[in-house]
Amino acid sequence: MKLLKNNIYINVYLKNKQEIFEFVFKKFKEDGAVLDSFLPAIVERDKAASVAIGNYLFLPHPVYDEIANIQKEKMVFIGLKDVINIDGQPIKFICGLALKGEHQMDALQSLAIAFSDPEEVEKLVKDKDLTQDKVLEFLAKHN
């Protein structure tokens, strides 16, 4: 599953988990990708184990049982206007996943690899002119 340019949002002002979950859900729901049960499923997944994985990345994705209810696979990437703190981690980037089976595992692995180099991630964090194209280049370069 490839991240599409029109699913990348830059300089978004969100200040906490709930706002992030609602924004991600709204973007998926607008496209008919998920059912209403998706929002509580991503909240539940985060309660089981934080989806703030370090290196400025937050990865909302549903509990396993919700995957069968995904109507259309989709990814969204959000670059926050400001770094916020979630579960003791600084967060600047969010990648919401509405993916099934292997696609979800592949995306999680690819994102973990892309965000594994602290120096490269720091460059992305400090980029004041971040664009959708730069995000796509960053992800492609590191996978």
From Swiss-Prot:
It is found in: Cytoplasm. The gene is mtlF. The active site is at H61. The modification Phosphohistidine is found at H61. Residues 1-142 form the PTS EIIA type-2 domain. This is Mannitol-specific phosphotransferase enzyme IIA component. GO terms for molecular function: kinase activity; protein-phosphocysteine-sugar phosphotransferase activity. Coiled coil: none annotated. It comes from Mycoplasma pneumoniae (strain ATCC 29342 / M129 / Subtype 1). GO terms for biological process: phosphoenolpyruvate-dependent sugar phosphotransferase system. One of its GO terms (cellular component) is cytoplasm. The lineage of its organism: Bacteria, Bacillati, Mycoplasmatota, Mycoplasmoidales, Mycoplasmoidaceae. The PTS EIIA type-2 domain is phosphorylated by phospho-HPr on a histidyl residue. Then, it transfers the phosphoryl group to the PTS EIIB type-2 domain. The phosphoenolpyruvate-dependent sugar phosphotransferase system (sugar PTS), a major carbohydrate active transport system, catalyzes the phosphorylation of incoming sugar substrates concomitantly with their translocation across the cell membrane. The enzyme II CmtAB PTS system is involved in D-mannitol transport.
